[in-house]
Design a protein with these regions (language model features):
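Fungal secretory targeting signals
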Residues: 1-24
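Sequence/structural signature of beta-propeller domains
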Residues: 22-524
């Protein structure tokens, strides 16, 4: 049997005490379903009924390879067939979580990409309130790990891709690759070259495979159930990062052993910006449509400046056959927020980059957009924009798939992020506010204020939708769902381990950031 957590004794005892605290008999939701928020998008009405759950993973938990179980909020996907309501009224299911490239506060490391298998148990807390807050009622247990490799079985790496050159395999596009010194952690080792992955999006294939989107390429990869790379999707040329008129996959994120390894110029002249690649990925329930989206606008159409990069692109692929087919492309105008730390009003309005998308039963997409630099472990604790919103395409939405926009340096917007005439983006509709104080208080959580374990983390980057059982539904004309969202803790801990447990670290911030998870109740 796989261990629950390999972590410090204090964290384990604390976690088990919470599990016991929220267990119990059958629970019943209130008769009247409250409406905390509502939006209409693409002709569909969506209602938010409140925060239904909260869970954590200790910052020093490790997987079966002895590595810190961090970064798992980068993406999650739930096996829909596993999600069931138990006789006691609780819900259980299997989730897969995707860490990004590893702890990189002091530089990127030779961390092998992986997917983490988790079990989830949600025990409803219908009486939770600000006056009587519930303890964490979402139990998250670690089950297993699958390591990701290249087509030849060579482990992947989180080290920044080389500024020039790439790795080649028959039947694959040029792949981002890193030349590794020593063991890739600052010690002695064999070196070599590996495919660079900064994983950010995850979807489950109907054949048991894993679809993964990454920021370095930006590419989409398909891996077997055992973790071997089977396929790579290269986006149109406009997306590919270029420096000095040459393909350049580096994200200007030098390795820990060579902090001066910065490409020139630092920012790509066109294509995806550094660390703003394919942040979001989702697949339709029938397994035929794949959607992937950039975190923000490309450098030839508003990037890299945060106040201009609001025109992001959304790609749609047909994956029903043996080979994927690029079919549609759309513009998504991202929301903005006012950075209250900026003294210059002309520079204070910034783009809320998106961190995830999720296919909805209506055919619309949910999109997670947020500010950055605010939350637990940051210099400022109060976030002003952290939402799960809705985007909807219609017959009036412009399909921008064309040579004009997809060629090298092809642009849909000006350098200040203004869309070109004639382009109609998808409809964008604000929906669930993560920062709503009245809902957070039900679980003793808060946005802004003290830097304690109940302060929301900065980076919320994942979405997964699961159904509410018909016995618990209170909305007769709509379908009800739980929306599960994990935060990315960036592997920040004072008791960290990587390189199969051999590399020990303590983040210089002094913080221990638990992975936080929220569960929202909604209907559509």
């Amino acid at each position: 049997m796989a261990p629950l957590w390999n972590c410090s004794l204090s964290s384990l005892l604390w976690f088990l005490s919470l599990s016991n605290a929220v267990s119990g008999g059958r629970v019943y939701p209130p008769k009247d379903l409250p409406v905390v928020g509502e939006t209409t998008c693409g002709g569909h009405t969506y209602q938010y009924h409140g925060l239904a759950g909260y869970g954590i993973v200790p910052s020093d938990a490790v997987d079966k390879y002895g590595d810190t179980l961090g970064g798992i909020g980068s993406a999650i996907a739930v096996e829909q067939s596993s999600w069931q309501r138990k006789r006691d009224g609780s819900y259980e299911g299997i989730a897969w979580a995707l860490p990004d490239r590893g702890w990189n506060t002091n530089g990127t490391l030779n961390v092998q990409a992986r997917v983490q298998k988790l079990s989830l148990k949600l025990t409803l807390a219908p009486t939770a309130s600000a006056e009587n807050p519930s303890k964490p009622n979402l139990q998250i247990k670690y089950l297993d790990t699958i390591l990701l490799t290249g087509p030849d079985g060579t482990p992947t790496t989180g080290i920044d891709a080389d500024a020039t050159g790439f790795i080649s395999f028959p039947g694959f596009p040029p792949l981002p690759g890193a030349t590794i010194n020593g063991d890739g952690f600052g010690g002695a080792g064999p070196g070599g070259r590996r495919i660079s992955l900064d994983c950010e999006g995850l979807a489950l294939g109907r054949d048991g495979s894993f679809w993964v989107s990454d920021e370095y390429g930006p590419y989409v990869y398909k891996f077997s159930r055992r973790g071997r790379m089977l396929q790579a999707i290269q986006p149109p040329a406009a997306y590919l990062p270029r420096r000095n008129n040459t393909l350049s996959f580096s994200a200007a994120s030098p390795p820990i052993y060579d902090p001066d390894q910065i490409p020139v110029p630092e920012d790509p002249e066109c294509g995806r910006n550094n660390n703003q690649g394919f942040e979001a990925l989702t697949i339709s329930p029938d397994g035929k449509k794949l959607f992937v989206m950039l975190q923000s606008g490309m450098n030839q159409e508003g990037g890299p400046k945060k106040r201009n990069r609001k025109q992001a692109r959304l790609l749609e692929y047909d994956i029903s056959g043996r080979k994927q087919r690029y079919v549609h492309e759309y513009a998504v105008t991202l929301p903005t927020y006012v950075d209250y730390t900026e003294e210059n009003p002309e520079k204070a309005t910034l783009v809320a980059s998106q961190s995830e998308i999720h296919y909805l039963p209506t055919g619309d997409l949910m999109i997670l957009a947020r500010d950055s630099g605010f939350g637990h472990g940051q210099s400022e604790s109060r976030s002003v924009y952290r939402r799960a919103d809705i985007i909807s395409k219609s017959r009036r939405t412009t399909d921008i798939k064309s040579y004009q926009y997809d060629r090298v340096n092809g642009s849909i917007a000006s350098s200040t992020g203004v869309l070109k005439a004639g382009i109609r983006p998808v409809e964008y509709c604000p929906f669930i506010d993560y920062n709503l104080a009245s809902e957070l208080a039900k679980f003793g959580l808060h946005n802004g204020g003290e830097q304690d374990r109940f302060l929301l983390n900065e980076k919320w980057e994942s979405l997964a939708l699961v159904p509410v059982d018909r016995r618990d539904r209170r909305h007769h004309k709509k379908h009800e769902y739980f929306l599960i969202s994990f935060s990315d803790n960036d592997y920040i801990t004072q008791n960290g381990r990587l390189n199969f447990g051999k590399f020990k670290y303590a983040d210089q911030s002094g913080f221990n950031l638990e992975t936080q998870a929220l569960v929202f109740h909604l209907s559509l």
